[in-house]
């Protein structure tokens, strides 16, 4: 994972991918180190911007999301990307090769909010020649990309049991406060989280249990992928026969290179958007050949190499890929 990062750090990040809220006692047991060692290693990864845990929408939380692509005027891409990155509903921003040299992922609590973003606010930003958007309608992969640092036994040991499901819960202002506080650090202690939102600790503990068991709140672990030995990111737009979209999505999820894979609706011929993390650009051709062999009907419509990633799930990234600041992802913010 770059200078100063060793196999234990890789294994620690991998364990937290599988179980973002695992205690340091659990992590130490799985990794066969003292809990204090696991804690010290994690604090160093966080303080240097190499890894972080943050809140994320659970599978039962109602939301809408879109892919927004733009062709920027010459010399304007960086300024446009900075403006995009400052918007709380824009959770990822990347500058790429190709005519459409910027893409962003946008998320909102409902369709009117999403429309206000992709129809009104984003296209009005100065420096754009052309824009297009598509709804993201089915997520195949996005929060569980791993480094391969754990043995099968360690994977089984650290993977949590599925939470017992309870009836649906509608998000309120208290829930939003918790979600936004946990954007900064998803592993905040109950005491620190209670202080951040100004509520009693027992109340915070009960509400978090409710949100996670209701499936409206989840957590994700991210890392500086450039630092992890995967410096090359590519984005592909695929055209797949409608009946095969789910099968192709499931196949792509199995590939270790796949970082994010989603079904698109309303984006023209393209109906799958996938990003991949590679050691080198030359590694892409074997991946495409593998996919074509498994699904001969898949057509690759567009391939772009990411030149600069400015934002990833709310984290503002430096040129070295490390987190340098946070713009909390806020689905409910006014546009």
Model-inferred region functions:
Residues 1-335:
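A compositional/biophysical signature of low hydrophobicity enriched in polar/charged and small residues
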């Amino acid at each position: 994972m770059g200078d100063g990062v060793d196999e234990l750090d890789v294994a620690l990040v991998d364990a937290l991918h599988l179980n973002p809220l695992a205690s340091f006692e659990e992590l130490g047991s799985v990794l066969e180190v003292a809990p204090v060692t696991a804690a010290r290693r994690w604090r160093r990864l966080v303080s240097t911007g190499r890894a972080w845990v943050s809140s994320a929408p659970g599978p039962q939380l109602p939301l809408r999301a879109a892919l927004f692509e733009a062709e920027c005027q010459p010399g304007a891409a960086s300024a446009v990307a900075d403006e995009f990155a400052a918007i709380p509903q824009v959770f990822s921003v990347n500058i790429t090769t190709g005519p459409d040299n910027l893409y962003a992922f946008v998320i909102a609590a409902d369709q009117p909010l999403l429309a206000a973003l992709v129809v009104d606010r984003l296209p009005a930003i100065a420096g754009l020649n052309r824009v297009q958007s598509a709804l993201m309608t089915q997520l195949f992969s996005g929060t569980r990309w791993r480094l391969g640092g754990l043995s099968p036994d360690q994977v089984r040991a650290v993977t949590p049991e599925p939470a017992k499901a309870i009836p649906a819960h509608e998000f309120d202002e208290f829930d939003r406060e918790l979600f936004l506080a946990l954007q900064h650090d998803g592993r905040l202690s109950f005491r620190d989280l209670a202080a951040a939102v100004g509520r009693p600790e027992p109340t915070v503990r009960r509400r978090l249990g409710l949100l996670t068991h209701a499936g409206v709140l989840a957590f994700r672990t991210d890392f500086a992928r450039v630092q992890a030995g995967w410096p090359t990111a590519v984005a592909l737009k695929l055209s797949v026969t409608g009946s095969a979209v789910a099968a192709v999505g499931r196949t792509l999820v199995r590939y270790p290179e796949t970082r994010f894979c989603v079904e698109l609706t309303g984006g023209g011929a393209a109906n799958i958007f996938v990003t991949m993390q590679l050691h080198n650009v030359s590694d892409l051709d074997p991946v495409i050949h593998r996919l074509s062999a498994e699904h001969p009907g898949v057509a690759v419509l567009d391939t772009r190499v990411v030149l600069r990633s400015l934002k990833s799930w709310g984290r503002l990234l430096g040129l070295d890929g490390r987190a340098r600041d946070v713009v909390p992802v806020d689905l409910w913010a006014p546009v």
